[in-house]
UniProtKB/Swiss-Prot annotation:
Species name: Shigella dysenteriae
An example Gene Ontology biological process: amino acid biosynthetic process
Main location: cytoplasm
Protein name per Swiss-Prot or TrEMBL: 3-phosphoshikimate 1-carboxyvinyltransferase
Upper taxonomic lineage: Bacteria, Pseudomonadati, Pseudomonadota, Gammaproteobacteria, Enterobacterales
Any GO MF annotation of the entry: 3-phosphoshikimate 1-carboxyvinyltransferase activity
């Protein structure tokens, strides 16, 4: 297996222009495909997940052109739901941001489409979304294991009263929200359980509004969506920088700055993960907010005990930053780490122990006490981009770290390690 050894880093300083947000990129691509008119998306993320969405849209007959660097995309909207000529199978890798929204959108009208993906995708639950779509009369068949992809979709979704469990993934609600306006009838979506990752729902609602669709949000408990609507192209749309990707550079600055400035997001960003900067500030770093940047300057870091449900992806970065904080850090309410690219709670606990931390892994929490000195370790990344990026922070100590399968960052940030090296000074 390929590996990358990072030598100790004495200091980080500089500016990072963030790649586009994965969450925003894939939502914007799908809405542009469903919309009337031509949409130009700029600062689109070029990554595996986005390529899976683009390949799926092409297979569904959506016409688009990409710039050479794949960050500018012109899409000719379909002016309504997407249909395949005859039976079709779409392979979506391990891209939850493609699988979930497409599973819903392709239930409109009549289709015969199979959605499948990598082995890990077949372990990521989708039953709550399927149950909800079936309440709206969608015809969906599980082809292997009940409640998991691959799925056969045969259209039929008309709207109506739909319940969805919000406790595992907000992507199920996102998928329903994006599909419901194109259904023939009104849809009332009722949330069962506690809604996780609420800020990701705000991204969805924000984008739907940009594409001309309003819905009624009743305190995140119930959403009322008028049927028979259509999406309208906003013309040009700039994809925000990826706030989860920003977390690694901001944390690096908190630990070994200097000052690092990330551009492409700012105080008015729609992504909940910008709140990560508040957590660093609470730990002792200095944060400065601009309209299109966030900067972080080093501080003495102290441990925290916090509910991280609102920033599940960026919270992983706090788990490795905790290695550099004084005291024991506890991250709570993070059960949904277990249903991501890998079981992130198990993976994080396992790898933190390798570098010498004392770790308590709970059902939905993790408690981390750093060692006096970090051990050298080979870090397994579980084909999970965030594991690779999180553990790069270990190099901010006096100890090198080896990252196995470093190219797995291609899911959201193909040149992550080059960018980190650019702002780093060797010890």
């Amino acid at each position: 297996m390929e590996s990358l050894t990072l030598q100790p880093i004495a200091r980080v300083d500089g500016t990072i222009n963030l790649p586009g947000s994965k969450s925003v990129s894939n939502r914007a691509l799908l809405l542009a495909a469903l919309a009337h008119g031509k949409t130009v998306l700029t600062n689109l993320l070029d990554s595996d997940d986005v390529r899976h969405m683009l390949n799926a849209l092409a297979a569904l007959g959506v016409s688009y052109t990409l710039s050479a660097d794949r960050t500018r995309c012109e899409i000719i909207g379909n002016g309504g739901s997407l249909h395949a000529e005859g039976a079709l199978e779409l392979f979506l890798g391990n891209a939850g941001t493609a699988m979930r929204p497409l599973a819903a959108a392709l239930c409109l009208g009549s289709n015969d489409i199979v959605l499948t993906g990598e082995p890990r995708m077949k372990e990521r639950p989708i039953g709550h979304l399927v149950d909800a779509l079936r309440l709206g009369r969608a015809k969906i068949t599980y082809l292997e294991q009940e409640n998991y992809p691959p799925l056969r979709l045969q259209g039929g979704f008309t709207g109506g009263n739909v319940d969805v469990d919000g406790s595992v993934s907000s992507q199920f609600l996102t998928a329903l929200l994006m599909t419901a306006p194109l259904a023939p009838e009104d849809t009332v979506i009722r949330i069962k359980g506690d809604l996780v990752s609420k800020p990701y729902i705000d991204i969805t609602l924000n984008l739907m509004k940009t594409f001309g669709v309003e819905i009624e949000n009743q305190h995140y408990q119930q959403f009322v969506v008028k049927g028979g609507q259509s999406y309208q192209s906003p013309g040009t749309y700039l994809v925000e920088g990826d706030a989860s990707s920003a977390s690694y550079f901001l944390a690096a600055a908190a630990i070994k700055g200097g000052t690092v400035k990330v551009t492409g997001i700012g105080r008015n960003s729609m992504q909940g993960d910008i709140r990560f900067a508040d957590v660093l500030e609470k730990m002792g770093a200095t944060i400065c907010w601009g309209d299109d940047y966030i900067s972080c300057t080093r501080g003495e870091l102290n441990a925290i005990d916090m509910d991280m449900n609102h920033i599940p992806d960026a919270a992983m970065t706090i788990a490795t930053a905790a290695l550099f904080a004084k005291g024991t850090t506890t991250l709570r309410n993070i059960y949904n780490w277990r249903v991501k690219e890998t079981d992130r709670l198990f993976a994080m606990a396992t790898e933190l122990r390798k570098v010498g931390a004392e770790v308590e892994e709970g059902h939905d929490y993790i408690r981390i006490t750093p060692p006096e000195k970090l051990n050298f370790a080979e870090i397994a990344t579980y084909n999970d981009h965030r594991m690779a990026m999180c553990f790069s922070l270990v190099a901010l100590s006096d100890t090198p770290v080896t990252i196995l399968d470093p190219k797995c960052t291609a899911k959201t940030f193909p040149d992550y390690f080059e960018q980190l090296a650019r702002i780093s000074q060797a010890a």
